[in-house]
Amino acid sequence: MWKNFKLNKFLLFIPLTSLMFCFNSPKNDDEKMQTIMVSVKNTLSYLHYSPKPINDAYSKDVYKHYFEMIDPGKRYFLQSDMNEFAKHETKLDDYINQGDLQFYKLTIDRLYQRVDEIDKITQEIFSKPINLEEDETLTLESKLKKVPADQKEQYNEWKKFIKYNILQEIESMNSKEEAQKEKKDSVQKFKLKDTIKLEILSPQQKLTKATDEVKDLVKETFTRFKKRKKMDWFSVYMNAYTEVFDPHTNYYSPKDKEDFDTQFKGKVIGIGAIIQEKKGNLYLGALTIGAPAWKSKKLSEGDKILKVKSKPKEDHVNVVGMLSDEAVRLIRGEKGTPVTLTVQKKDKTIVEVTMIREEVAIEDTFAKSIIVNSPNGKKYGFINLPSFNADFEDEKGRNASDDIKNEIIKLKAQNIEGIVLDLRNNGGGSLTEVGDIMGLFMNAGPYVQVKDGNGKIQTLKNKQETPIWTGPLVIMQNEISASASEILAGVMQDYGRAIIVGSPQSYGKGTVQTFVDLNRFLNSEDDFGSLKLTIQKFYRITGESNQRKGIVSDIQMKDFFTYAEIGERYDDFALAWDKIPSATFQKLSYFDVKALEKASNDRMAKNANYQLLLESAQWREQLDKEETITLNINKFNDLMKHRKSQIEKFKKLTKFDNGLKFEMYPAEIEREKKDEVFKKKSEMWIKNLRKDSYLQEAMNIVADMKAKV
């Protein structure tokens, strides 16, 4: 299930300080977890938009949800474990009321015990020849799986799981082999100078190589699991309690909250390097141009990280074998402070590099635009907005509305005639940014209504009087467009200011969250983490909720997500849809939606690439519904051949070109000459845009709007 959890700043002024829980300062981890349990329960009961009674029915829901989270594939626990755990099924309400850890400790201790046992089981499986000639099947659908009755059954299930992964590895080798053959044939056919070295492995060699690959993967999985501290599972346990209230109410440990803030702000204080984990070691990934790691001229992608010195007066910390997220926290720190990395270069030399931490922007978080030269000779603008980012701690920090404004100004300087704003895959963000972005396209007016748990309704208004773009506007969305994306698309649709194009409906998240710092309620200096809490529901200015139903596109174009179970309506604990009175607003008469829809539908009916996309999506849906798969290599190969015959006709999709010509800004063209990484990213972005059939039609629609179809 796709879930998009985004912070909304709105209504952080709610008087939470009036709520106070008194506890003595915890002396150990157990006392800390007990304090968190009771604090979370009290916060949920007092402040959640729609608090649930903490009773046996609630306990049963938490119990079921918990095991779906910690053992979704039913591979770890035995039926004897589940029989023992079942005695607690109606007691979890009592445990959270009392801060009782017995069930949490019982299940997590047992989980680690079973992991140790299964580690040995898999070693035994790999110590014997793998027979892929047996006529067996593996159940893929977790809902149809049964918990293993005993260790013998568990052994057999893991053996099947390993066989399946080996078969997939062999199939991957076969596909690469076929691709090499095709490339070599092309070289010979066209008498090219390229030399293609063809590596053909025997079936036994493939089996041996695939088995070794899967063995290493399984070993690394268990190694990583055992490195994880038991207390790290406490967040999972607490979220079993919180998510039964609604899927967007979540407990965040201090480090989880730090990660959330980093992503939301679109910046991090560090050295500007990706940290990658491979077979128990940590390596430097891509370096951000202009960031400390890049500026050092001593570090490179692929360097093995041996030690980190986080502060001048602290010792070097050996990070070999450490989890990547732990090492990242050593490398990050306060702006302007030094950090030292000891790395092993590819030539085995050891280098120690000291850098000063800086603010590094996460560029993929921010809006970006490009000029589109259409086949009709007109220029249009395309703006992609990945999230409604905002930095509430820094007034000078970047935010989505300022970024969009800057992109519009750049596009207007190029004399564009229409704009396509892409909100596909945008999971939301700051509610206040929605109003500010709306104000860039139209005059002041209400943009959303919010209702709290007491039924109080408030209408939020955009106060910007003068828009900077009043021309044709298309907004693209899909099933993953959620929350703030849905508010913006909904209000622009309600006013008639923009045409909404894309999936039949968006995600359907119609709730507002805020972060509650648990420390503020407790008389302690310890960090207890935070609770992201649903405190309101939001409604369109028409009074209709976005909850579950989402935003229905004016012009619908189905995609791969259309056929998947994505959206709020598929979550068991999602709040219900409802309606409140409409706000007062005046609808604009910008475009003839029906005429635009007809023109688009006529084009898409004749668009061979779009029709093939739909066929491919429907075929993938059928694959997703398959409940079992054969583990016999001959039958598996036959199945793969059949699938490849289906895939063959979809290969045209990879060669599609929408005919649009994309043009970078003059300043970006100059930057490409100096910044190779930026150049490669730009080239890849344009390459993907040229394969976008949906963008092609969005540009057709914005052209129709300009022509007043």
Model-predicted regions and their roles:
Residues A484, G496, V501-I566:
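Polar, glycine-rich mid-to-C-terminal structural blocks
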Residues M37-Y49, K87-K91, D216-E220, P386-N389, ...:
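Acidic/histidine-rich, surface-exposed loop or edge segments in extracytoplasmic proteins
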Residues K52, E68-M69, T90, Y104, ...:
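PDZ/PDZ-like domain segments forming the peptide/carboxylate-binding groove
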Residues I121-G270, I274-K279, E676:
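Extended, domain-scale alpha-helical bundle/helix-rich regions
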Residues N8, S18-E31:
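Bacterial Sec-dependent signal peptides at the C-terminal "C-region" and cleavage site
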Residues F23-N28, S45-N55, T223-K230, D246-G270, ...:
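Cleft-lining beta-strand/loop regions that shape enzyme active-site pockets
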Residues I125, E141-K143, N156, K160, ...:
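Conserved functional hotspot residues or short segments at active or partner-binding sites
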Residues S25-E133:
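Charged, amphipathic alpha-helical regulatory modules used
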